[in-house]
């Protein structure tokens, strides 16, 4: 009986380790954020995890205040960034975290301090960097990340009354964790 109990605990521990560990070939991506004049205003590093995609958002020179941040459906960033299409929404859900099942590209607002600089990490469990999956940001026309002038109200369809698009970055592949020493993007 003691052997079975020990075997069960070892099996459970192995299963948990497999579920929560990051594979060595984790997919990485990056988006260089630029404003409408083409000036760099930040970067978004994306890393595939077992729980979804971890986005590390670093901005500098963005107007202080609350700004909507979304993954958009098209990998184009021609000013004024309407070329990025609507929010990434492969499942055709309504917009907003307050609507139940939100767009896959719906994200929490960014709260930019008076310095205009922010570094924050956000997990999006609704998207993937794995090509061929229905919720992959690497579909036929790619994807972009967009910062809006105003906050997302988390409910108004289709875009949360977030206002104009003030910064945009095309999501591009940047290898795997194995190519950067097995570490998350910096």
Task: Go through the PLM ranges and name each one.
Residues 1-12:
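Bacterial N-terminal signal peptides that target proteins for export
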């Amino acid at each position: 009986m003691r052997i079975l109990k020990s075997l069960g605990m070892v099996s459970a521990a192995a299963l948990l380790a497999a579920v929560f560990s990051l594979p060595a070939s984790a997919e990485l991506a990056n988006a260089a954020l630029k404003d409408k004049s083409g000036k760099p205003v930040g970067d978004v590093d994306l890393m595939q995890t077992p729980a979804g995609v971890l986005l590390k958002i670093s901005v500098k020179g963005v107007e202080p205040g609350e700004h909507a941040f979304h993954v958009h459906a098209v990998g184009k960033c021609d000013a004024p960034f309407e070329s990025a299409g609507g929010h990434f929404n492969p499942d055709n859900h309504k917009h907003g975290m307050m609507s139940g099942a939100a767009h896959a590209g719906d994200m929490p607002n960014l709260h930019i301090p008076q310095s205009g600089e922010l570094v924050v990490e956000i997990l999006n469990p609704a998207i993937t960097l794995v090509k061929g999956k229905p919720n992959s940001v690497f579909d036929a026309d790619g994807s972009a990340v967009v910062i809006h002038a105003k906050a997302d109200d988390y409910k108004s369809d289709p875009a949360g009354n977030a206002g104009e698009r003030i910064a945009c970055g095309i999501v591009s592949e940047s290898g795997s964790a194995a190519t950067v020493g097995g570490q998350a993007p910096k």
